[in-house]
């Protein structure tokens, strides 16, 4: 290859010729004289100008001269820099031309070597590369099949995740509805408790009223018993007084029978007198006693009648109130029993709803845990598959690059061996072949090592 490059370089000759640049600079003294002459001429011209105008023109001329001088210096510096860079470039190109001429001469003097071992080596490497490519293609097919299966599994897992999420949403809605229903039941239970408390307060008030009525009835009965005893005592007293009066009558009758014969006083009847006086006294006593007994009897009868009437009216009223209170108590007891039964039923319902809510929460937690596990497993599988796919694609790209470099190298060697190359661009092909040889051999070596 080097000999071919030398032969190609012989057909080309360097057309770059060395160039010489001469920079002439005037002497400062001559420049000063020229400036002096220009100044003298300008002085002769300006001598006819007034002093103020001359001063203005001289200051503007000095400013223009300084500006032109600075501009010329910058231009000269730029030209010097460009010249120095151009000279360096010319020296570099001359050295490169000499180097290329030396390489061309070395390639001309080099003998043609046998390229058959190189061809065999590259064909062997190419066969190995093709074998590796076929193996990787088969493994790629297996990996693609496995990837398709995993993608199907991922799709099924996604559908399962969607199903679990929908079920979780349904469970959440059901839990929310049960929570709302439970709140309604708790509110109703609280209202029932308040109603039961108010009914218990009313029942306590009615009990107090009933106790007061019963106490009043007991007092009235005690008063009735007292009045009855007093009436009986008065009856007994009246009976006693009546018997006493009868006794006194009998006694008087007996006294009349047993009295001695009255002394007859002439002109005066003492028996009739005492009899009439005694009868008069007895009548007065009987009248006074009867009046007193009648008054006592009337008073007792009136008092007893009024008390009896009061007791009767009070008993009727108390009986009606007592009956009404008993009916109200029975009604309240029935309502309390109904509320207690409803409270027990609501407590049972709340307990069952809480148990159902706990069960649904547990099922939801299990489903969420399974969903998280499935997600983690899915993410791990996807990460593993992506890493595996990335490595397979990298190996495939590596092998494709190696294959392309080997094909280019083989094409170059075929052209060299078959003698179809032209002199124009031969050195470029040789350099490309040398570069791709090293790159292709290194890539093929890495691919074989990684596949093995």
UniProtKB/Swiss-Prot annotation:
GO terms for cellular component: intermediate filament; nuclear envelope; nuclear lamina. Residues 260-278 are annotated as: Linker 12. Residues 279-424 are annotated as: Coil 2. Residues 1-13 have a biased composition (Basic and acidic residues). Disulfide bonds: none annotated. Residues 425-452 are annotated as: Tail. Residues 1-75 are annotated as: Head. Residues 76-111 are annotated as: Coil 1A. Pfam families: Filament. The modification Sulfoserine is found at residue 156. Residues 1-50 are annotated as: Disordered. Residues 72-424 form the IF rod domain. PANTHER family: INTERMEDIATE FILAMENT PROTEIN IFA-1, LAMIN DM0-RELATED. Belongs to the intermediate filament family. This is Retrograde protein of 51 kDa. It comes from Lymnaea stagnalis.
């Amino acid at each position: 290859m080097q000999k071919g490059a030398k032969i190609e370089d012989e057909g080309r000759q360097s057309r770059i010729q060395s160039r010489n640049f001469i920079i002439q600079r005037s002497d400062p003294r001559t420049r000063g004289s020229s400036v002096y002459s220009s100044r003298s001429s300008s002085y002769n011209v300006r001598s006819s100008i007034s002093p103020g105008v001359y001063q203005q023109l001289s200051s503007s001329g000095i400013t223009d001269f300084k500006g032109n001088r600075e501009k010329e210096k910058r231009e000269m510096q730029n030209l010097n820099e460009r010249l120095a860079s151009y000279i360096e470039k010319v020296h570099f190109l001359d050295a490169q031309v000499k180097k290329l001429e030396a390489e061309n001469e070395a390639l001309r003097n080099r003998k043609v070597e046998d390229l058959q071992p190189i061809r065999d080596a590259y064909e062997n490497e190419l066969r190995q590369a093709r074998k590796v490519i076929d193996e990787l293609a088969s493994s790629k097919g297996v990996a693609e099949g496995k990837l398709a299966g995993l993608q199907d599994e991922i799709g099924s897992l996604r559908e399962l995740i969607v199903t679990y999420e929908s079920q979780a949403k349904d469970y959440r809605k059901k839990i929310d509805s049960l929570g709302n229903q439970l709140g309604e039941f708790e509110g109703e239970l609280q209202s029932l408790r308040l109603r039961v408390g108010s009914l218990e307060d009313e029942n306590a008030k009615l009990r107090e009223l009933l106790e007061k009525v019963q106490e009043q009835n007991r007092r009235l009965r005690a008063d009735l018993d007292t009045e009855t005893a007093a009436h009986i005592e008065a009856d007994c007293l009246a009976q006693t007084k009546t018997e006493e009066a009868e006794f006194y009558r009998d006694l008087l009758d007996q006294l009349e029978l047993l009295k001695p014969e009255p002394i007859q006083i002439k002109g005066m009847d003492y028996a009739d007198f005492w009899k009439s006086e005694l009868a008069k006294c007895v009548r007065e006593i009987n009248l006074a006693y009867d009046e007193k007994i009648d008054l006592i009897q009337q008073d007792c009868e009136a008092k007893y009648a009024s008390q009896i009437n009061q007791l009767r009216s009070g008993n009727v009223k108390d009986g009606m109130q007592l009956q009404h209170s008993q009916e109200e108590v029975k009604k309240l007891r029935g309502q309390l029993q109904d509320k207690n039964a409803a409270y027990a039923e609501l407590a049972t319902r709340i307990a069952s709803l809480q148990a159902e809510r706990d069960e649904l929460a547990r099922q939801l937690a299990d489903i969420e845990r399974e969903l998280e596990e499935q997600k983690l497993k899915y993410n791990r599988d996807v990460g593993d598959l992506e890493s595996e796919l990335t490595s397979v694609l990298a190996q495939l790209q590596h092998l494709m690059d190696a294959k392309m470099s080997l094909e280019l190298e083989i094409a170059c060697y075929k052209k060299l061996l078959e003698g179809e190359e032209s002199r124009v661009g031969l050195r470029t092909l040789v350099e490309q072949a040398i570069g791709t040889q090293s790159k292709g051999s290194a890539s093929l070596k890495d691919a074989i090592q990684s596949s093995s």
